[in-house]
A protein has these predicted regions:
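Interhelical loop/hinge segments that connect adjacent transmembrane helices in multipass membrane
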Residues: 1-6, 120, 181-182, 196-244, ...
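C-terminal transmembrane helix end/exit motif
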Residues: 1-3, 100-104, 144-148, 152, ...
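Helix-loop junctions and terminal segments of transmembrane helices
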Residues: 58-74, 147-148, 206-208, 265, ...
């Protein structure tokens, strides 16, 4: 069953990724030609700003997800209900924290980007982004349950349909109105709708669980979760410093146009890495399930295989990126004005390679 669920997760995720990445690429191209570097740059910058706020999540999602593996195997519904209730409460606290910090941080936005480079609608853009991330934390917690139960593939058809509709509507809006606020509003509405429908599906799928349990978590389970969160804090902080500070630094010390150019390289990198991460993320719950069964020897063997696989895949990817990044962007896609010199491209490739080698550890 474990292998079967992994295959289903990989196949469904791959199908979803192909469709959404193709449409997302088309949407990005139209975005660039209709709105230009300024809006592209501010979009990338705000994603990094809110990535900074997301550190407050502290790895709670991963820690709770790990704690769910064993009770799911043992069908301990009481413990599952208790964990999910704590998870819901924790994410409410995180959402409130991010909202407060986001409001405060807006006062210091000029520190990251010169006011002369900011779009005139920056106030509305900023708080629409903030609204989206806060609502996401309030509504998305149940997806960890179905992922830990190796049944994430059941959500993929719904996600594909809604993502296709969202991207097509956004493309149409950009072509007709050439305006950013409406584009963002469509994204927020879509995110809320997807989360509501997914929550309803998961609630029905696990109707035997109580998502508002009043039972207390066993002391030993508390210790395990706290230990995992403390261990994950360093990982979360490290991931942010490596992957989410680039746009902040570029915007502060160079300009918003360079952030826009950089974001195109990162988009391509993320599209390719999305296919690679499907392999690792789709087996995460299966690997956790294996650990929960106490098979340490088998777990170490699987880890060694994953580490070797990541080395081979990311080495090939690094060489490909180095050779193809600039020819693709400059000659085939959006023109040479969106290119970085090769020494910067090399830095992007090395950073991605080193991050990729950590994938089995993160898994």
């Amino acid at each position: 069953m474990r292998i079967e669920n992994s295959i289903k997760n990989i196949a469904s995720s791959l199908c979803s990724n192909i469709v959404t990445s193709l449409l997302g690429f088309i949407s990005r191209t139209i975005f660039i030609y209709t709105l230009g570097k300024s809006y592209l740059g501010i979009s990338a910058l705000l994603q990094s700003v809110f990535g900074l706020l997301a550190i407050s999540e502290l790895g709670i999602s991963t820690a709770i997800g790990f704690s769910l593996y064993k009770p799911l195997v043992e069908k301990n519904n009481k413990l599952i209900s208790t964990l999910m209730t704590i998870y819901k409460k924790a994410y409410r606290v995180i959402a409130t924290t991010i909202l407060i910090l986001g409001i405060i941080l807006y006062k210091y936005l000029d520190f990251f980007v010169d006011p002369s480079q900011q779009p005139k609608e920056i106030f509305y853009i900023y708080f629409m982004y903030l609204t989206n991330i806060v609502i996401g934390y309030l509504l998305s917690y149940k997806t960890t349950l179905i992922s830990s139960d190796q049944k994430g593939y059941k959500l993929i058809p719904l996600q594909i349909k809604l993502n296709i509709i969202t991207i097509l509507v956004q493309i149409g809006y950009l072509i007709i109105f050439k305006e950013y606020l409406g584009y963002l509003a469509i994204q927020i509405f879509s995110s809320i709708l997807i989360n509501i429908i997914q929550n309803r599906f998961i609630t029905n799928e696990y109707s035997y669980l109580n998502f508002s349990s009043k039972d207390k978590l066993p002391i030993e389970e508390k210790r395990i979760i706290i230990k995992n969160i403390l261990g994950l804090m360093a990982t979360k902080l490290g991931d942010f410093c490596v992957n989410s500070t680039d746009n902040l630094i570029i915007s502060k010390f160079v300009d918003l146009a360079s952030v826009a150019i950089y974001s195109n390289y990162i988009m391509i990198r993320n599209l390719v890495n999305g296919y690679i991460s499907i392999l690792f993320s789709s087996i995460t719950s299966s690997f956790g399930n294996l650990i929960a069964e106490g098979n340490e020897k088998k777990s170490l063997e699987i880890f060694d295989i994953l580490f070797l696989l990541s080395f081979i895949i990311y080495s090939f990817e690094a060489v490909s990126f180095l050779c193809l990044f600039n020819p693709f962007i400059g000659d085939l896609w959006i023109g040479k004005e969106y290119l970085f010199p090769m020494h910067i491209v090399l830095a992007i490739v090395i950073n991605n390679y080193l991050t990729g080698l950590r994938m089995p550890i993160i898994t």
